[in-house]
Amino acid sequence: MTTINLIIFTLLIVLTAFFVATEFAIVKIRSSKIDQLILEGKKGAISAKKVITHLDEYLSACQLGITVTALGIGWVGESTFEVILHPLFAHFHVSETVSHVLILVIAFVMATFLHVVVGELAPKTLAIQKAETITLLTAKPIIWFYRILFPFIWFLNGSARFIVGLFGLKPASEHELAHSEEELRILLSESYKSGEINQNELKYVNNIFEFDERIAKEIMIPRREIVAISSEDSYETIVKIIKTESYTRYPVLNGDKDSIIGFINAKEFLSAYIDTDQKIKEDFKLENHINPVIHVIESVPIHDVLVKMQKERTHIAILVDEYGGTSGLVTAEDILEEIVGEIRDEFDKDEVPNIRKVNDNHYILDSKVLIEDVNDLLGTTLASDEVDTIGGWFMTQQIDAAVGSVIEADGYIFKVHETVGRHINYLEIVRKKE
């Protein structure tokens, strides 16, 4: 009898471990990973796909199995330990009452220890670390267990849904296991800390989250910095501008910057006349080299701008303000840089970074850097409803700003480092000494 009890007790512990490992494994593994295993022809992958596709039902089966085996462990464990320990207490002439209490306590402690450690904690750790292997091994057995006890599981699930419904709540579903953006950011941060992803991967994904929140105005090249050519410029004038400015593309004006009719590609333009004589160069027609641009309101999300640029097959979007005037432009490169970071080509060798770190707590910032980026960099809480950039913020705080003008805010000293006319080019930022 004692041997049979021990076998049953051990079997119940093993079954508990099976259900616990299955529960954690099927929750941990990704559906995309199972799809990959199916393509590789892994044994058990199709069964695993069925399980994670109907996650609610099979989690209920696991929970039922854990509950039943736990009750069985308590029931069998008490009688098993009583058979083992009773002769020992009798040998030492311990009274029946005392020995019965001691046996109950010892049985409870031992059964709890074995159930928690061997039946739950160890399988849980194993399932989390080896989710793929455990899922493939346990998928078919849990499917058979579910089929055998389907009526009972269906009744229990229905009862649970009814009780939850009394409180005006809907039962959880596997389709509701999706994570919010904030949860995904936390998961990514934890993955980075544990070494699962590197810093660049973390940065790219965070940039993608911020991508939809950016509007075109925040990343544009402002009107005053647009280098353009006139539709009436001569060949020599255009070549001189290209040599001086070294940009890839140039907007073409029909009068002023409020009338941008397209753009030229410097490489295509120069290639067209590289082997031609002077007469052809003098008689060239600029309209033959003009590519179309799109015009969008400056407040449109950059995602929408990129989609429109792809649809229209153009590299430049002209931004207009609410009055119809040109406020700036964005290129496809500007938009992509919001995800992958700075993209430098052969013309960018002399380009100055927007944020230059002099030393700890000492920076020189381009006035076009966004206020929110400054807050992220410094840990400040600067804000303005009227402007987006740090240069604009400074001008709203001090309307007669000039080189050397200073503002103190949030523990930092903001100083005008360089200006061009009335425009602030760079700000110097230093942390205040305590």
UniProtKB/Swiss-Prot annotation:
Residues 1-201 form the CNNM transmembrane domain. SMART domains: CorC_HlyC. Residues 220-282, 289-346 form the CBS domain. CDD domains: CBS_pair_CorC_HlyC_assoc. InterPro entries: CBS_dom, CBS_dom_sf, CNNM, FAD-bd_PCMH-like_sf, FAD-bd_PCMH_sub2, Ion_transp-like_CBS, Transptr-assoc_dom, UPF0053_domain. It is a multi-pass membrane protein. SUPFAM superfamilies: CBS-domain pair, FAD-binding/transporter-associated domain-like. It is found in: Cell membrane. The gene is yrkA. Belongs to the UPF0053 family. This is UPF0053 protein YrkA. Pfam families: CBS (PF00571), CNNM (PF01595), CorC_HlyC (PF03471). GO terms for molecular function: flavin adenine dinucleotide binding. It comes from Bacillus subtilis (strain 168). It comes from the Bacteria. The chain crosses the membrane at residues 7-27, 64-84, 101-121. Its main location: membrane. GO terms for cellular component: plasma membrane. Keywords: CBS domain, Cell membrane, Membrane, Repeat, Transmembrane, Transmembrane helix.
